[in-house]
């Protein structure tokens, strides 16, 4: 039998990437609203550019948020603390343009008290379809390429913040990982691309010499530390700052906007995406909460050993609590002789995908031990700190199919 061979690539960006700066500010604002009023309705968008931050959107809340203080703290924590970056926490201008949510939308989301079932009282915040995915490629049940890509830029940030080596690093960075597959199994890393912002070369060192130093440091302190040695061979291509100098970056180099890194936020292109971004949205927005729930369904199906891969789609109508449709596809990897229809039937009985039920199950209105700002860099999935990553339905799924 001939082997199926192909290459697959995913990318990530660091917390200092301009789009991620925007995401983190939006989610930090959301966190503060929810801390004051867990019923807050928030849709917060952020725009960042040279020396400027604009925060806008719609809210319904009893809370009062100091956008200036929140944004400056986020920017400081990321590491934009030097004037030479042309985007600095204490000196950048910050404009808040938050205003009240449309009563038409609010009327559809918050239903009347006389409805008997509390989970039917909260309708979906909008129409749309959301996807969840899980697979057996990594211990986190995530696709390997996106996991590696996330880990690489996260390691760069950890080194930069620790300040003991590679002290020339600046906050902006990107990564990209290409894996070679045989029969749907990742066999090796074919290519890694890392572009990291850095200080100018020291006096007496040429640009070419400086880039060689950076390349060597990234390979030794980042790539070799994170990527398993058996996944890298003499044919693996390593592209470190392939364009050369990368001094101008962050919001000064490129304008950043909330919600522009939706594939980085999810599965690196290994699964479909419904198109709705996450950051800055309270959990009544199913773009966010239902995507988290769909991941929870897919992960539990795979963790229960029912399939090696699982894609879940759920869709909603605005103001309606129950999903319009649910779809499960195990990509011909279902086990124990099960069909996708059988798995879907049991999953629909076990997982309540009404928005209010999702919010209650995960505590999305009152985050405990985590916050939304944490989701806004390095991925919303494959990280155990988040409640939707729990495999707490495995026993029920196994019992439903009478599996030991």
UniProtKB/Swiss-Prot annotation:
Binding, K(+): 45
One example GO MF annotation: methionine adenosyltransferase activity
Domain of life: Bacteria
Residues bound to L-methionine: 58, 101, 254, 285
Alphabetical list of InterPro entries matching this protein: ADOMET_SYNTHASE_CS, S-AdoMet_synt_C, S-AdoMet_synt_central, S-AdoMet_synt_N, S-AdoMet_synthetase, S-AdoMet_synthetase_sfam
GO biological process: one-carbon metabolic process; S-adenosylmethionine biosynthetic process
Organism: Chlorobium chlorochromatii (strain CaD3)
CC annotations in GO: cytoplasm
Name the UniProt record assigns to this protein: S-adenosylmethionine synthase
Keyword Chloroplast: no
Binding site for Mg(2+): 19
């Amino acid at each position: 039998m001939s082997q199926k061979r192909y290459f697959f690539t995913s990318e990530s960006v660091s917390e200092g990437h301009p789009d991620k700066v925007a995401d983190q500010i939006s989610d930090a604002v959301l966190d503060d609203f929810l801390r004051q009023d867990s019923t807050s309705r928030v849709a917060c968008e952020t725009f960042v550019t040279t020396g400027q931050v604009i925060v806008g959107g719609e809210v319904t809340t009893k809370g009062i948020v100091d956008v200036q203080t929140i944004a400056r703290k986020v920017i400081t924590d990321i590491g934009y603390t030097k004037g030479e970056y042309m985007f600095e926490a204490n000196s950048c201008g910050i404009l808040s343009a938050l205003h009240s949510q449309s009563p038409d939308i609010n009327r559809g989301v918050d239903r009347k008290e006389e409805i008997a079932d509390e989970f039917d009282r909260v309708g979906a915040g909008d129409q749309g379809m959301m996807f969840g995915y899980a697979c057996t490629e990594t211990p986190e049940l995530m696709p390997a390429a996106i996991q590696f890509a996330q880990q690489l830029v996260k390691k760069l940030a950890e080194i930069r913040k620790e300040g003991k080596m590679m002290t020339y690093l600046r906050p902006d960075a990107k990564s990209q990982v290409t894996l070679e597959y045989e029969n749907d199994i990742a066999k090796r890393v074919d290519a890694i691309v890392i572009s990291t912002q850095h200080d100018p070369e020291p006096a007496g060192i040429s640009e070419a010499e400086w880039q060689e130093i950076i390349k060597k440091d990234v390979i030794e302190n980042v790539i070799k530390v994170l990527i398993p040695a058996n996944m890298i061979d003499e044919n693996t291509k390593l592209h470190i700052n392939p364009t050369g100098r990368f001094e101008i970056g962050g919001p000064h180099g490129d304008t950043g906007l909330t919600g522009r890194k939706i594939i980085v936020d999810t599965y690196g292109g290994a699964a479909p995406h419904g198109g709705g971004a996450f950051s800055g949205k309270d959990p009544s927005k199913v773009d966010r909460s239902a995507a988290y729930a769909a991941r929870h369904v897919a992960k539990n199906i795979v963790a229960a050993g029912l399939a090696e891969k699982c894609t879940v789609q759920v869709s909603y109508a605005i103001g309606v609590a129950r999903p319009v449709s649910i779809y499960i596809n195990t990509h011909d990897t279902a086990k124990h002789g099960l069909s996708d229809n059988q798995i879907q039937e049991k999953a629909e009985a076990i997982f309540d995908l009404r928005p209010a039920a999702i919010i209650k199950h995960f505590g999305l209105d009152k985050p405990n031990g985590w916050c939304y700002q944490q989701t806004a860099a390095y991925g919303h999935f494959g990280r155990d700190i988040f409640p939707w990553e729990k495999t707490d339905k495995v026993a029920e799924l196994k019992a439903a199919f009478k599996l030991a």
